[in-house]
Amino acid sequence: MAKEKARYFTFLLYPESIPSDWELKLETLGVPMAISPLHDKDKSSIKGQKYKKAHYHVLYIAKNPVTADSVRKKIKLLLGEKSLAMVQVVLNVENMYLYLTHESKDAIAKKKHVYDKADIKLINNFDIDRYVTLDVEEKTELFNVVVSLIRAYTLQNIFDLYDFIDENGETYGLTINLVNEVIAGKTGFMKLLFDGAYQRSKRGTKNEER
C-alpha cells in the first residue's frame, strides 16, 4: 500500500505539534490544499474524555501521482518530525471536502458536530468545483485504461483483472480500489468485455491448433 500512487491525500495536523507559521509553510509547497476548521468538538469514545484531541484535517492535491509515503516525508520535512503520523489516499475529493466540516453523508449519519464551512482555509488556489470535475474526467480516463488492458491482455474475468492489477497496477496508475470505483455501475459492459476476451482467447487457441 505504501507504493500506491495517487494525487489526492488527507492527513491530520495537531496544533501542539506544528510551528506557528504552519499555514505559510504549507503554501511554499505550491500545491492546492483545503484545511478544515479546528476540530475541537469531536466527541471521544474514551471513557472520561469528552472530546478528541483538537486537530485539523488537510485535503492535499498533488501535481502528479505520488505515494502517500512521499507526501508524509515532505510534510514532516516542512513542519517537523512529529507534525503528522499517517497520510491516506482520498478516493473521492468531494466527499473528503464535505468531511472537513462533517457535512459528508457518513459524518451526518454518525451525527458528528458540524463545523462552519466559512472557516475552511484554501491554499494555492484550491477550487473544489475543479477537482469534482476532474474526478469525473479521471474516472472516464481510468475506465478507458481498464478497457484497453482487458483487450490487450485478453483478461477473461474479474479475477484475471485483479491479478493483473496486483502485479502491474503501479505502471498504469491503478489499484484494485480504483478499478472497483471506475467499473461500478458498468456490470453489463464489463460482461461484454470479458465475454469478448474469452471469445478472442478461444479463437486464438483454435488458430494455434490448425
From Swiss-Prot:
Any one cellular component term from GO for this entry?
Answer: extrachromosomal circular DNA
Q: Which InterPro entries match?
A: Plasmid_rep_C_sf (IPR041919), Plasmid_rep_OBD (IPR002631)
Which key words are in the record?
DNA replication, Plasmid
MF GO annotations = DNA binding; DNA topoisomerase activity; identical protein binding
Task: Note whether ATP-binding occurs among the keywords.
Answer: no
Give the GO terms filed under biological process for this record: DNA replication
Keyword Transferase among UniProt keywords: no
Entry's family note: Belongs to the Gram-positive plasmids replication protein type 2 family.
Name assigned to this protein: Replication protein RepB
Q: Which organism is it from?
A: Streptococcus agalactiae
